[in-house]
Amino acid sequence: MTQANAAQGMGSYILFTVAGTTYALPSDAVRHMEMVEDVTRVPNAPAFIDGVVFSRGQVVPVVNLRVRFGFERAAFDLRSRLIVVQSDGRLIGLVADAAREFVRIPPDAIQPPNEALTGMSGRYVEGIASMGDRLVLILSLDRILNFAEALTVGLAD
């Protein structure tokens, strides 16, 4: 197999951290990343919704992944990133503690999550990749966004 053919079989992901754990999302779902700035609070929003931001000409709801996964809220800093993703034509911003890198992960390095994986973040995990000496939890964007669905519908009205 040539190097080009091997690369075609690999999935491209963006790695980011939340509460010290490395997570990944497929890079084709990520529209762009930016610093977290000027979040406008929304009355009566669920605790995991920080509010909305104006990003590249559009109002985007902001989901705080720390809170969504059951971790303690942390103040934004220079490393905090808003990862703007698109699903079903909707843009949603996901706040991460830091965005690390874009990587390619071969399919054989990804295993399904163990049934014992529990907790708030466990329900969103689609797979676990072994990358050298670290494990990366690959998230299901659909599962994360299904939880935020009611809010995005409400904000769009």
Kindly give the residue locations of the regions a language model identified.
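An acidic, low-aromatic, low-complexity terminal/linker signal
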Residues: 1-157
